[in-house]
Amino acid sequence: MRKYVSVTIMTDRPVDQATNSEPERPGNATARHDNVALLSVATTVADRVTTSADIEERLRGVLRRLRLPMGLLERVAGVKERRNWGEGQTFQDAAIDAGRRAMAEAGIQPQDVGLLINTSVTRPHLEPSVAVRLHHGLGLPSSAINFDIANACLGFVNAMSVAAGMIDSGQIKYALVVDGEDADQVQLNTIDRLNQGGRNRKDFMSEFASLTLGSGAAAAVLGPADMHPGGHRIVGGVTRAATQWYDLCVGSVDGMFTDAKMLLKGGMELVVAAWNEARSHFDWADMDRYVLHQVSDVHTNAFVEAIGVPRDKVPTTYQRFGNVGPASIPITLADEVAGGRIRPGDRVFLGGVGSGINTAMMELRW
């Protein structure tokens, strides 16, 4: 059985890399939204549990040869288990399922949707978009704009921002943002490659992050706040880029290769810069919850230290689900709401870093 959760609910750049010497203003990479609410979030949790011990058992030989200890994934990343789809399940079907339940929770019909954005990193082919398959499966009208936003692990928050802007402009009334991920093939390929001869510790650690990935799906409905007084206001947010680090994490279905040390360093420098720049537009120092992209203990602790927020206000789900890419933030948000840890009136921060490097931050008022 599938398990469901539904809730209503720069680094400093050299001068020659700067794109604009003028101060950042709302409406560019900093935005405020006037009349947009998050109406629902729904998630689909994959059936099959794969523990870190299961993966390491399949890598026992190479771990022994490289003199790396068993228990490394849980000790270093904090990931105890992750989910994979069972036989006959696909990430696209899961995304459709989450989308249907998100619409039902929001109280809207497929014909009401004016925009569908898919943010999946996983894709079975280069074209057409994953969005067209989801558009068809969800029974959306021909008038519903549909496309993919691919921006590594930030795609879902980016899509919420794009959708919010289109709602504020009056172009659409309701938007459905969806994401489905399947980590199975990339992990199988990674395990096979690491078990081949000639791999050293550097090779192993460059593919370590692939072993922490998980499968899952999520969807959210956004709509006009004035028509939904019970919705959760999307206040606004910021995005910033440090694309000089574009090659620190490069992935495909064959594998994901990461310079983890430099990615963390560059990512946290960008987070600090974006956080400091956001202070003139937002007061995020004392939010009720900080829902971050889910990667590892190391990443979460670094983010908390970088922006100086209380660790007990930062929920984590990577221990159970691993890194589910763009679905991680909505999965964690839904988990917090379902557990009663986000309540009416709470101020909620969404944020993360995506390979490339980009960061996105957003404020919700529950």
Where in this protein do the model-derived segments appear?
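Short beta-strand segments
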Residues: 39-42, 119, 150, 175-181, ...
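A glycine- and small-aliphatic-rich helix-loop capping segment at beta-alpha/alpha-beta transitions
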Residues: 55, 60-61, 129-141, 164-169, ...
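Claisen-condensing/thiolase-fold acyl-transfer catalytic domains that form or cleave C-C bonds
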Residues: 96-99, 122-124, 135-136, 141-143, ...
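Short glycine-rich phosphate-binding loop at a beta-alpha junction
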Residues: 112-119, 285-293
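Acyl-CoA/ACP chain-elongation machinery
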Residues: 171-190, 242-246
